[in-house]
């Protein structure tokens, strides 16, 4: 149920603003309870450094500031909303930085692991997949919570041999433990999207559990899932060898297996094997 006072505040903030930009995938959340649940799922502590992607009118930002993290970075591509957040700096005790940038080009790999980084955002549908592919594999973060299109969320948590299982499933499950937190209907946004959204949390896997070459895995996934209905032996015919054949036998997989039949761990092993062949 939408909180009328909260909706009034959000409406006031957007009344004098330019219209939501379709090119930026802007759909502004209007529900106080859902905003609170999304931020609560991030489990913010006093030592955390929070990065919010695309804060817009601040539906999540207000709750993040109330949670009192050590610092808050706002990554905003829209010049209007970046300016609004800069003007509001003096109204909060939380150390806040507003960065006018495209999160797709942000240097996630430069986040130092000596700080507790937490990532959050209502991600635009049109960039959510490539953005999560990068930031959840490159950034040294301790937790992330994103609201995305429900269909994309279903793909992320999908299991092998399911219709939704694909490259994004394997990649993110190789770097994180994703969990679906809640489903959000279109009615709580302005303008309304045409589909449901899902809120997912991500806990990073320890480095000891990521014993694979990210570059090799990324290439392998893109090759395999571009031809997901073909047999792996045919997809990988350029790289097929006695060692690869032996690996399939060891895993109990026939050469006729298709990409969706391999688990994330099996893709990691296969990527390492293929890379070792190429460099030997």
From Swiss-Prot:
- The EC number(s) given in the record are 2.1.1.182
The first-level EC class reads transferase
| Location in or out of the cell | Cytoplasm
What is the predominant subcellular site recorded for this chain? cytoplasm
Family annotation (SUPFAM superfamilies): S-adenosyl-L-methionine-dependent methyltransferases (SSF53335)
Mind telling me which InterPro entries this protein's record contains? KsgA/Erm, rRNA_Ade_diMease-like_C, rRNA_Ade_Mease_Trfase_CS, rRNA_Ade_methylase_Trfase_N, rRNA_adenine_dimethylase, SAM-dependent_MTases_sf
Single GO cellular component term: cytosol
> What are the record keywords, sorted?
Cytoplasm, Methyltransferase, RNA-binding, rRNA processing, S-adenosyl-L-methionine, Transferase
Name the residues that bind S-adenosyl-L-methionine.
27, 29, 54, 76, 102, 122
Disulfide linkage? none
Q: Which reaction does it catalyse?
A: adenosine(1518)/adenosine(1519) in 16S rRNA + 4 S-adenosyl-L-methionine = N(6)-dimethyladenosine(1518)/N(6)-dimethyladenosine(1519) in 16S rRNA + 4 S-adenosyl-L-homocysteine + 4 H(+)
- Molecular function GO labels: 16S rRNA (adenine(1518)-N(6)/adenine(1519)-N(6))-dimethyltransferase activity; RNA binding
Q: Which domain of life is it from?
A: Bacteria
Give the protein family.
Answer: Belongs to the class I-like SAM-binding methyltransferase superfamily. rRNA adenine N(6)-methyltransferase family. RsmA subfamily.
HAMAP family, A to Z: 16SrRNA_methyltr_A
| Protein role | Specifically dimethylates two adjacent adenosines (A1518 and A1519) in the loop of a conserved hairpin near the 3'-end of 16S rRNA in the 30S particle. May play a critical role in biogenesis of 30S subunits.
The record's annotation in PANTHER family points to:
DIMETHYLADENOSINE TRANSFERASE, DIMETHYLADENOSINE TRANSFERASE-RELATED
Protein known as: Ribosomal RNA small subunit methyltransferase A
This protein's species is Oleidesulfovibrio alaskensis (strain ATCC BAA-1058 / DSM 17464 / G20)
